[in-house]
Amino acid sequence: YAQVTFDGVPARDYSMANQPGRDHLEFHIRHVPGGATSEHVARSLKVGDEVSVRGPLGSSFLREQHTGPILAVAGGSGLAPIKSIVETALASGLRQPIHLYFGARTERDLYLVDHFSLLASTYDNLTFMPVLSEVSRSDHFRTGLVTDAIVSDVQDLNGWKAYMAGPPAMIDASGIMLRELGLRGEDIHADVFFTP
């Protein structure tokens, strides 16, 4: 992630959403009504405005030397760093199974579903599973907690690596669940922060 400063508002930490080494940085910034920084970005930021970026920071990045399965868990705009990790793994030619779970409250809270669905249909080692915590009128998405979906699908995570990003409560619950399924602490990677 990086610490991003916009003129006149508090600095915030945001995860990069694009692959490393690109000539630009991509950030996904959720608009939080009343949030000083996200309000500024949504209402006032213009092309050409100066932005200060400090980083990269944190420890949640793809470990390309890992050859076992990968579990990627995202909640809300936590999809940004997971997008970077998954796209980097695919672009690097990693062939192990990659299971991406994207938890959201409602269908309105989902984004990039078409993007990841296309990637999953292009790469046979990628599985993409959006999970809605509130019951949906659509039968296109699984419902329930993202942690319950993972437990239902995967009974043993021994030898896996997990990358998580999202709300702190989801990260905490996921970390407990991952350890219960046999994942070692050193194989769980997440940078936990909240940026209104």
List each model region and its residues.
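Ferredoxin-reductase
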Residues: Y1-D49, A104-T106, V131-V135
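Short, flexible hinge/linker loops that cap or flank conserved catalytic cores
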Residues: P20, R63-H66, S92-L94, D156
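A short, basic/flexible loop-to-alpha-helix module at the beginning of a structural domain
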Residues: G55-T67
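Conserved beta-strand elements of the Class I
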Residues: I70-A72, Y163
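Hydrophobic/small residue at the entry helix of a nucleotide-binding pocket
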Residues: S77-I82, M170
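Histidine-anchored nucleotide/phosphate-binding helix
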Residues: P81-A91
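Reductase modules of NAD(P)H-dependent flavoproteins
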Residues: P97, Y101-P196
